[in-house]
């Protein structure tokens, strides 16, 4: 007996109130208890990775230690390249950047498990991260530069008559960073998963539509080979999107931290 399981079900959001009360009416939440639990588990994994990498002092490191050290060194390299080689800034902002990279990467990897939930495929998760980043960046700007922070919206040498227009344009551009950061991650993660789902469902439908054993083997084997290749590409995309998210976050921080140097 064939059980119809929709691979795109991982993109569905069920409210916490309907999960508890068994009713979809008068919903007070948009994120299910399962999704909250997964986000909590990801947070614990990030903390565990950071703790292990920080407390490892083995004379002969294991393979796991080497992977973690490479992970940490790579993120630290991104921070230094974008924000600067100043040791103080690197130590201040590295834990934040490392946490964001680890959270996004682990979320993407967990989404590669069939029928699992992919947090970064939901705009509510990525937009929450990006808005928090931009609020934090803005607060850092005010803390470091006080009122000079507003000079970010007025390029040097701007004619006085063009100041109001350029301030408006720069402010919109600055505010749009949060939305572009969130949409870029969500769109790229969702696209690959949707392609997986479409190919899987078409393969199952084609297999059920034919009666020949040979044709059934072809309709299953060929899409399966394509899915294996796509799976490898999606693993690369998961890493690449984590890197892009981290790189852009560092870039936004660098604009604020090094504002007085330009």
From Swiss-Prot:
It is a multi-pass membrane protein. It comes from the Eukaryota. Keywords: ATP synthesis, CF(0), Hydrogen ion transport, Ion transport, Membrane, Mitochondrion, Mitochondrion inner membrane, Transmembrane, Transmembrane helix, Transport. The keyword Methyltransferase does not apply. The chain crosses the membrane at residues 30-50, 64-84, 91-111, 123-143, 149-169, 195-215, 220-240. Gene3D superfamilies: ATP synthase, F0 complex, subunit A. The keyword Transmembrane applies. Its main location: mitochondrion. GO terms for cellular component: mitochondrial inner membrane; proton-transporting ATP synthase complex. One of its GO terms (molecular function) is proton-transporting ATP synthase activity, rotational mechanism. Mitochondrial membrane ATP synthase (F(1)F(0) ATP synthase or Complex V) produces ATP from ADP in the presence of a proton gradient across the membrane which is generated by electron transport complexes of the respiratory chain. F-type ATPases consist of two structural domains, F(1) - containing the extramembraneous catalytic core and F(0) - containing the membrane proton channel, linked together by a central stalk and a peripheral stalk. During catalysis, ATP synthesis in the catalytic domain of F(1) is coupled via a rotary mechanism of the central stalk subunits to proton translocation. Belongs to the ATPase A chain family. This is ATP synthase subunit a. The lineage of its organism: Eukaryota, Fungi, Fungi incertae sedis, Blastocladiomycota, Blastocladiomycetes. The gene is ATP6.
């Amino acid at each position: 007996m064939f059980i119809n399981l929709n691979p795109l079900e991982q993109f569905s959001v069920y409210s916490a109130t309907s999960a508890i009360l068994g009713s979809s009416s008068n919903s007070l939440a948009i994120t299910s208890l399962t999704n909250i639990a997964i986000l909590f588990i990801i947070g614990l994994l990030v903390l565990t990775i950071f703790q292990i990498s920080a407390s490892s002092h083995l004379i002969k490191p294991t393979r796991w230690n080497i992977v973690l050290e490479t992970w940490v060194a790579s993120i630290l390299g991104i921070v230094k390249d974008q924000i600067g080689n100043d040791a103080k800034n690197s130590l201040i902002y590295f834990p934040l950047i490392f946490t964001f990279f680890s959270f996004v990467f682990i979320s993407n990897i967990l989404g590669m498990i069939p029928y699992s939930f992919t947090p970064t495929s939901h705009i509510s998760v990525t937009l929450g991260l990006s808005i928090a980043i931009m609020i934090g960046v803005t607060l850092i700007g005010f803390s470091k530069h006080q009122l000079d922070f507003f000079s970010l919206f007025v390029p040097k040498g701007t004619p006085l008559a063009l100041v109001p227009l350029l301030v408006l344009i720069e402010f919109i551009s600055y505010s749009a960073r949060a939305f572009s950061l969130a949409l870029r991650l969500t769109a790229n993660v969702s696209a690959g998963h949707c392609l997986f789902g479409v190919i899987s469902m078409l393969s199952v439908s084609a297999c059920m539509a034919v009666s020949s054993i040979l044709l059934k083997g072809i309709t299953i084997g060929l899409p399966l080979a394509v899915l294996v290749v796509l799976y490898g590409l999606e693993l690369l995309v998961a890493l690449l999107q984590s890197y892009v998210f981290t790189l852009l976050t560092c870039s936004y921080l660098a604009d604020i931290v090094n504002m007085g140097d330009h």
